[in-house]
Swiss-Prot record:
Species of origin: Psychrobacter cryohalolentis (strain ATCC BAA-1226 / DSM 17306 / VKM B-2378 / K5)
Official protein name in the record: Glutamate-1-semialdehyde 2,1-aminomutase
Keyword Glycosyltransferase: no
Catalytic activity annotation: (S)-4-amino-5-oxopentanoate = 5-aminolevulinate
Main localization (coarse): cytoplasm
Assembly description: Homodimer.
GO molecular function: glutamate-1-semialdehyde 2,1-aminomutase activity; pyridoxal phosphate binding; transaminase activity
Essential cofactor(s): pyridoxal 5'-phosphate
Cross-referenced InterPro entries: 4pyrrol_synth_GluAld_NH2Trfase, Aminotrans_3, Aminotrans_3_PPA_site, PyrdxlP-dep_Trfase, PyrdxlP-dep_Trfase_major, PyrdxlP-dep_Trfase_small
Listed transmembrane segments: none
Family: Belongs to the class-III pyridoxal-phosphate-dependent aminotransferase family. HemL subfamily.
Amino acid sequence: MSTKNEQLFAQARKHIPGGVNSPVRAFAGVGGTPIFMHRANGSKIYDTEDNAYIDYVGSWGPMILGHAHPKVIDAVKKAADDGLSFGTPTPFETTVADKICEIVPSVEMIRMTSSGTEATMSAIRLARGYTQRDKIVKFEGCYHGHSDSLLVKAGSGMLDIGEPTSKGVPADFAKHTITIPYNDPQAIKDCFEKWGEEIACVILEPIAGNMNMVIPSQEFHDTLRAECTANGAVLIFDEVMTGFRVGLGGAQAHFGIDPDLTCFGKIIGAGLPVGAFGGKKDIMSCIAPLGGVYQAGTLSGNPLAMRAGIAMFEDLTAEGFYDELSAKVDHLVDGFQAAADKHGINMRTNKLGGMFGMFFVKDSATTVPQNFDDVTECDMELFNTFFHGMLDRGIYLAPSAYEAGFMSIKHSNEDIEATIKAADEIFAEMAKA
């Protein structure tokens, strides 16, 4: 690690808690000093000494077109020339809303926010207002932002009311949140049998991108939809990570499930700060000014993010875009798996559309993880070794074994081959250790 980078981190720690503005950036999970970046272009991100890294984080998902895409940058420059924020309705937010509703059939109306956390927080408030119920259900290992109701883990029993995972969250808030195992249809049935008439909503990542990448069974989703419908609960898909990433229609299109509400993140603004939640018209009509559920934001639907999103959707909706993106992921992940197998490394992978996951499992008999407990059983030290080996070779992966990877359309065959070659070298070293 360069002395300059260590100096930057020390300087940051003087006035920024932990030296970062989001905990995962601190490299606490993998060890070492975080790298400070100052620019990016295409498939690559550059540190402050202008060393290039092939980037598979993509600002945690939204850089699906690659960094600094000319069309997006041009749209943002033109938007900035016209004024940064108006605090009024604009035609641009209507265009983005129309486009999302056209692409995602379950979304009949949509409201813009400034972040994914705002989107999930608002969707839950809306579900509670719509149903006139208090309890919400979430799943172990799913992350939905840092609002108080969602920073909750399972209690001592599987169907207990949750307890906070963060200091500063009152127990009175947490008592309304029920946390159950992910990808477990029976747990859903048991939960509704016990609490059904009190449950306002169930919120989940339809593909979990915050426990690396766990793809649940079709039965899991079918059970969720059936139980929510039977008990009058609102089904909320948090597609902040999967929306427009695993496919144009998101995870809900992949599974053929229509949620009642869907949350989106910064991908709809091509990486600028933005979020959204939308769904059935009768539910969305409960939002102010039409209904009694209050939600607002000075920067919601800001013109820079909306105009960037309009430019991005032009490419996402082009014929063959997701076929090409998926082929790149197949190339990378299949190469990883082949290299791991060659050297006897116990690695399992998942992939769909532009997302992928890698798990260093304990032994050759262990299959790909199916839930949070499975992920926590993986070899975190081996992942850390892999992460730093890749970083030393100019490959930037998420600095956590619990985060998914992302491909952009700008990753070239040369980028992918270089990444596979680096992985092969590290696996060879691991095999000798």
